[in-house]
Amino acid sequence: EVIQATKIISKAINAKGIVFVVNKTFSKMEELQNCGIDNSRILIINNSKFPCGFKREIINEFNKSLKKSLPFRVSKNDLFVDSSTMYDVYKSILLKLPSIDKMVHFTGNCIYSSCLLNVKLGTSIKDIVNQIGGFEKNPSLVVINGNQTGASVSSLDVPITKYTKSVS
């Protein structure tokens, strides 16, 4: 789905090239290598270092490893899109489904088990936590979108938005 959406977006904006950024444990490397998109490359980021995945780090890593092998350059002015957004593009364009839900990863040592849920936009974190069995113990902090780059929430009444990727 992500590859199909990438083809659609790259054609729509007349992209000179595509760089897929993945971590070293990415399991579908062969699919990306055989995606059929001209001037596409895979950039493997070491996500054990902090920070990782920001535009600046991606550009720096690109300049170190791929710059010489491609007929295009990457800069902060280019389009950077994450895989969940590309999945939403796929659902909207190819399946004709509006974006009314979001895949959200719930994890942490205060819930009984980690899970990836398809959540309706606007649903509160509190409602979702109740649906997955509540808290095993009271959390000292709840963070949206990762411990390294995310933001803590002041209340569990905060809704899931189109920008929410994870809750921990």
Specify the residue positions occupied by each region the protein language model found:
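Hydrophobic alpha-helical positions that pack around
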Residues: 16, 21-125, 132-136
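A general structural signal for short secondary-structure junctions and capping/turn motifs
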Residues: 10-11, 96, 159
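Generic structural signal for individual residues within well-ordered alpha-helical segments
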Residues: 3, 126-129
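Histidine-anchored nucleotide/phosphate-binding helix
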Residues: 1-13
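Ferredoxin-type iron-sulfur electron-transfer modules and their immediate structural context
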Residues: 102, 134-168
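Residue-level preference for well-ordered alpha-helical positions
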Residues: 10, 129-130
